Amino acid sequence: MSIITDVYAREVLDSRGNPTLEVEVYTESGAFGRGMVPSGASTGEHEAVELRDGDKSRYGGLGTQKAVDNVNNIIAEAIIGYDVRDQQAIDRAMIALDGTPNKGKLGANAILGVSIAVARAAADYLEIPLYSYLGGFNTKVLPTPMMNIINGGSHSDAPIAFQEFMILPVGAPTFKEALRYGAEIFHALKKILKSRGLETAVGDEGGFAPRFEGTEDGVETILAAIEAAGYVPGKDVFLGFDCASSEFYDKERKVYDYTKFEGEGAAVRTSAEQIDYLEELVNKYPIITIEDGMDENDWDGWKALTERLGKKVQLVGDDFFVTNTDYLARGIQEGAANSILIKVNQIGTLTETFEAIEMAKEAGYTAVVSHRSGETEDSTIADIAVATNAGQIKTGSLSRTDRIAKYNQLLRIEDQLGEVAEYRGLKSFYNLKK
């Protein structure tokens, strides 16, 4: 009754209006699962391959019909007949069927859509929530949200190099209250921006994208919004950055060239100067997390940054690790970073995603479950965050339904868990010296 009988993919649109995949899996019993695949704008060069058609006459070359066909004509034939509950066997079968180190043959987007749909179908077959199916009886930790309320870099047209300015409501007693803190700060920020005559249009991840005078202007404005909403920076709410440094790192000159986003007159920093600058910001403001502070291939820079700041700030590898256990293992061995960003489409299966989270935790690294800038209404990452007791999630600002869908799912999960639910706030940063 739990045997897979049909697998079907179709092309749908993501939050940027670009094509992506939706996959459906059916079993003999009638159990059903559906998975939708996100897409990134700033992508690490070592990520698994997102298969696009390249036909410029259709969606500007971004169509996903090849990936859809790979699901319907190749993957479906290979996994029909499997027990839907055997997630690892199905994921391994798809990896073997692809046969490349980066899933470049079938496409990570094709494989991931099936992987998610299989898990959802199994949960439906067992008549339990997805987080319970994935995590078992010890599932209880609601994640501390990283809320991206200012968008810069590749996620907006604002002249700021850093891609994300985030708030983290660590002082809230529950996830529900943490979400309220964030929403109130978001609206306070909007009022401040309007009062200054700045734009309140939002970027890809739902944050504002105003023309600030620079990074520190953005930080000071966020701090003012936190206080205007009635909260205390550095107690109720901390700050975080996603620098996305690979987006403005000049490989030939080996410098961090802020002029790419901030224009003529902006800083051009060496690796050592980049570390000094980040330390300066950390010493000045209540910053608890920095993502991709160094370029993805600047291993010496990452190690130096970790040695300098790794005891007091969470240093998250996104493009640096690309949710890949090979890169994470090297980082652990060399003492580079102290946290990994978990993006399911960077690696391509739920099995490999869970392996990366487990490896990080065993090494004392934190794991931050994350969305992509091109999202859908699929809320699987909310269930993954709770299933793994990851303790942190990054899923955008307090606007756009593609972001709110994840927050609303976490509210449902917190309700369903009842008294068992834990919101750990600052304790989610377990590898820092408070």
From Swiss-Prot:
Alphabetical keyword list: Cell wall, Cytoplasm, Glycolysis, Lyase, Magnesium, Metal-binding, Secreted
Annotated catalysed reactions: (2R)-2-phosphoglycerate = phosphoenolpyruvate + H2O
Q: What is its EC number?
A: 4.2.1.11
Spell out the SUPFAM superfamilies in the cross-references. Enolase C-terminal domain-like (SSF51604), Enolase N-terminal domain-like (SSF54826)
Q: Which residues bind Mg(2+)?
A: 242, 291, 318
Cofactor(s) for this UniProt protein: Mg(2+)
Report the protein's function.
Catalyzes the reversible conversion of 2-phosphoglycerate (2-PG) into phosphoenolpyruvate (PEP). It is essential for the degradation of carbohydrates via glycolysis.
Q: What is this protein called?
A: Enolase
